[in-house]
């Protein structure tokens, strides 16, 4: 764009002001979608996305050791590359999956990601705690792991999200561009967000550092790529949720993700 296409005033803690002008804004605000909100641009159409999931989560104290539970059941863990309790645990369920992240100070972050297609009508009205306890109680091993757990001081409540998926109507515009996580989010399954964001940073750096001054064309092409990539991730993730009731089919479909 033309020099000084964007302008802002920065106010420091002492009240001093500095006016800045710049050619490009890179929106790295994620779910905040700062630029699209500032410009009043519409969100994308979620009806085109096949993945439809919600999460119920919190932080807990006193979650039992999964390694100890496996040992009690005499499960063979000699092929495990590391102890289960020191890794990011993913417990695959028929209607979704559970993450379990044990921090060094004994607090555990745990959450259910559930396929909304498998939930009963009216799930939006079910309290978060009831949803959590109902699903955990359906799996005896998980019920044992959480039977003595208490909510941590923070946030000290169960949190239920609305639909996790979001996608922007556009990823770029005149003088602005969004990083992939700002453009959209599909699902925490497979943890695609970090790698996708890093690839966006790398591609935009190549565009802006190139000798070619026609940055807008390169940025627009990048934006179309990112929107297409989000829709591909949607297909990969949605297929995994469809296959979840069958361990064999779920594992086979996951291979498409690893091949991609």
Label every model-predicted segment:
Residues 1-144, 201:
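Predominantly flavin-linked oxidoreductase catalytic cores and closely associated redox partners
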Residues 18-20, 218, 237, 253:
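A general marker of short, structured functional hotspots
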Residues 27, 61-64, 215-218, 246-247:
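Poly-acidic low-complexity segments
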Residues 39, 104, 190-194, 255-260:
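Short secondary-structure transition/capping segments
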Residues 88-90, 236-237, 255-260:
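Short, highly charged low-complexity linear segments
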Residues 94-98, 104-106, 116-238:
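FAD/FMN-dependent oxidoreductases across multiple families
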Residues 244, 248-260:
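C-terminal auxiliary extensions adjacent to catalytic cores
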